[in-house]
Amino acid sequence: MDEQTRIELEAAAFRRLLQHLRDHTDVQNIDLMLLADFCRNCLAKWYGAAAKERGIEMEYPAAQEIIYGMPYAEWKAKYQKEATPEQLKAMEEIQRRKEAADH
């Protein structure tokens, strides 16, 4: 497979992932973090970093809007639910493990 075709396939898969996340607003970011160690906000940060690597200035809210398909504040108001105490406890544990691994 040539490089251009690989890039096009990766871009198509990424667009499909974004659409899947947009279609499944019931899946909360904290659920993604707990299961896969990334969420929509991580994708926005990675997107912005990729833009910066190519000399494109992109503010984080602009990257979030690309990932969410709408301004983050709007998505949050429509779809984000309050994290449960169990979810928050699990996130704290993940953070502790990450910090321990960094030392």
Question: In which residue ranges do the predicted regions lie?
Answer:
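Domain-level signature for proteins that mediate thiol-based redox and metal-cofactor handling
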Residues: 1-103
